[in-house]
Regions:
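Hydrophobic Val/Ile/Leu positions in short beta-strands of Rossmann-like dinucleotide-binding domains
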Residues: 8-10, 84, 107, 111
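A structured beta-alpha segment of the ubiquitous adenosine-cofactor-binding alpha/beta core
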Residues: 58-80
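Rossmann-fold NAD(P) dinucleotide-binding segment
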Residues: 78-81, 89-108
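A short helix->loop->beta-strand "cap" motif at the edges of active sites that frequently abuts
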Residues: 55-56, 101-103, 128-130
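Aromatic/hydrophobic pocket-lining residues that form π-stacking "cages" and hydrophobic walls in ligand
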Residues: 45, 94, 121
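A contiguous active-site-proximal alpha/beta segment in oxidoreductase catalytic domains
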Residues: 112-140
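N-terminal Rossmann-like dinucleotide-binding module
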Residues: 1-54
Length: 140
């Protein structure tokens, strides 16, 4: 079985939620981190990517560039999903951009702060037949 390939936005070194997403996604060895923009600070971004075995050419200075470049990839090289592990107030815009680039999403909670934003993302993802999952870690 082919491993799912994923990218991360946020969740760099020292970000607990990033570790939770990365470990959770790769726990059963069915997914592999292939790309990311882990920090707004380039040196921290590179450090995180190197630590997690991401090829230098797939470590990006910002998530916009990452989405643009990764959307160009095809076949076995294309990402299966993108994890969003950024501050809560950034989720809506990032998820909206990921949907526009045609990737499935796993976003940390909360995805949005308003029901209007949630309905908008649901409609956008539904038009493209994308999965938009919310990660609820350590919830019973």
């Amino acid at each position: 079985m082919k491993k799912l390939q994923f990218a991360m936005v946020g969740g760099g070194n020292g970000a607990l939620i990033g570790d939770i997403h990365r470990i959770g996604a790769q726990f059963d060895d069915l997914a592999e981190l292939k790309a990311g923009c882990f920090s707004r600070h380039w040196d921290k971004n590179l450090e995180a990517g190197e630590k997690w075995g991401v090829e230098p050419g797939r470590i990006y200075p910002d998530y916009h560039t990452m989405l643009e470049e990764e959307a160009k990839r095809t076949g076995e090289d294309r990402l299966d999903f993108v994890v969003v592990a950024t501050p809560n107030n950034t989720h809506y815009e990032i998820v909206k951009d990921i949907i526009a680039h045609g990737f499935h999403i796993v976003c940390d909670k909360p995805v949005t702060f308003t029901s209007r934003e949630s309905e908008e993302l649901k409609a956008l993802a539904g038009k493209l037949d994308e999965i938009n999952a919310t990660h609820l870690d350590r919830r019973i």
